[in-house]
From Swiss-Prot:
This protein's record includes keyword Oxidoreductase: yes
EC identifiers of the protein: 1.13.11.54, 1.13.11.53
GO CC annotation: cytoplasm; nucleus
Subcellular compartments: Cytoplasm; Nucleus
Note on how the cofactor is bound: Binds either 1 Fe or Ni cation per monomer. Iron-binding promotes an acireductone dioxygenase reaction producing 2-keto-4-methylthiobutyrate, while nickel-binding promotes an acireductone dioxygenase reaction producing 3-(methylsulfanyl)propanoate.
Record's compositionally biased regions (Acidic residues): 1-10
One Pfam family it belongs to: ARD
GO MF annotation: an example: nickel cation binding
Protein name: Acireductone dioxygenase
Organism: Puccinia graminis f. sp. tritici (strain CRL 75-36-700-3 / race SCCL)
Reactions catalysed, as given in the entry: 1,2-dihydroxy-5-(methylsulfanyl)pent-1-en-3-one + O2 = 4-methylsulfanyl-2-oxobutanoate + formate + 2 H(+); 1,2-dihydroxy-5-(methylsulfanyl)pent-1-en-3-one + O2 = 3-(methylsulfanyl)propanoate + CO + formate + 2 H(+)
Cofactor: Fe(2+); Ni(2+)
């Protein structure tokens, strides 16, 4: 995993790195409520699933071959800024991609490069987006506390006032009093 401030000036495709010179540490991600583990085996995933009460899982393959004609439509959907009312938990089994999350100012994107073995947990209420990288392939295990579902609430006035969003802002505000990045 590698995290850094997303270079907004770049005119490149969202699937490019958009590398800036500002790196973001694992500790800084934790202040945003984002959790990360480097996982070598399914046994480690199972252990975290038990600790965090993840009862269900499935797998998604995001590639032109796996998704066919709907691939670009799905990429566009995933890259639209949105939040969820549940944690978003992904363990990368193969391939790579980028999760972008809003920083504590809600003005900049923090880009998180994920690759095989990376397990990422995004908290409910955080605005984020996802895309594969230039290799156009990722296979990820999705973990869920309840029944598998993926309900995205795109950024809007309505989603800004969502109770999960408000709870997230309160949580991050408390973490930021301990030192912003």
């Amino acid at each position: 995993m590698r995290a850094y401030i997303y270079d907004e000036e770049s005119q490149l495709s969202p699937q490019d790195e958009h590398e800036s010179s500002q790196s973001v540490s694992k500790q800084e991600l934790e202040k945003l409520g984002v959790l990360y583990w480097s996982i070598d085996s399914i046994d480690q995933v199972n252990s975290i699933a038990i600790q965090r009460d993840y009862k269900n899982r499935d797998q998604i393959i995001c590639s032109p071959q796996a998704m066919g004609d709907i691939y670009q439509q799905k990429l566009d959907t995933f890259f639209e800024e949105h939040l969820h009312e549940d944690e978003e938990i992904r363990w990368v089994v193969e391939g790579s991609g980028y999760f972008d999350v809003r920083d504590q100012t809600d003005q900049r994107w923090v880009r998180i490069k994920v690759e095989k073995g990376d397990l990422l947990v995004l908290p409910p209420g955080i605005f984020h987006r996802f895309t594969v990288d230039k290799d156009n392939y990722i296979k990820a295990m999705r973990l869920f506390k309840d029944e598998p579902k993926w309900v995205a609430l795109n950024r809007s006035t309505e989603s800004e006032s969502n109770p999960y969003r408000k709870a997230y802002i309160e949580q991050v505000g408390k973490a930021m009093t301990m030192g912003a990045f």
